[in-house]
Amino acid sequence: MKFNRRVREKEMPKKKVVETKVQTGIQGMDDLLEGGLIRNSTVLLRGKAGSGKTIFGLQYLVYGALHEEPGILLSIEESKRDLYREGAKFGWDLEFLEKSGKLAIIERQTQYSLTIHELERTSKDIGAKRAVIDSIPALFSSYPNELQLTELRPAFNLLCQVLTNSCDCTAILISETDWSRKYAYEEYVPKGMIELTSKMMEGIARKFLLIKKMREVRHSKREHLYEITENGFTIFIPIVSNLGRSKNE
């Protein structure tokens, strides 16, 4: 049988290409990560109050929602109404994205196991590919009787496994700097950790982002200045941004 050269390209079987990187959609961030986060990974984002952690997470989810990657936000302390208002400051219509099935904002349940189940159920309902937990300290402190100190690490590991395996998501886990250091979570976060800090320079408080750890990615090892602008979280990258990169195995 001779091959028909007139067969249209669309009729030819195409090999499915699986994209291994997830673009954050945050200006400057993906340039520091060789294109984005590793798909189906969990990354810890830590910083003090007012550093912009929630904005970072929202921007990550909004970008995904607008690019066929629905997302889940588990918000422990902020209500939907508060989040809607926060998003509106940057032109993000979170309520519309929710109604469109591109975003789901869920609250903690009465038990930790029920919260895990709600994450799994919601991810299947909307076909989620992204998730943000805001925040880990608030989540765990919500269950003082269920999660004792010795149970925090296995509870955290379970959360990571559920997000990446059961939920099939690439997740950002938000934490407070002091709390994260106290429990040394960076030692067993599966993929990476990003830290937000501030410094006084010439009498002005400047904000900096540092990728402290990101396995399987050649990433910047420098601190990078960032600001919260009308467009959201913006990272400034110097022209010589390729310097100071290393391959983390």
Residue ranges of predicted features:
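C-terminal regions of RecA-like/P-loop NTPase motor modules
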Residues: 2-19, 220-249
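Phosphate-binding/switch loop-helix module in NTP-utilizing enzymes
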Residues: 107-165
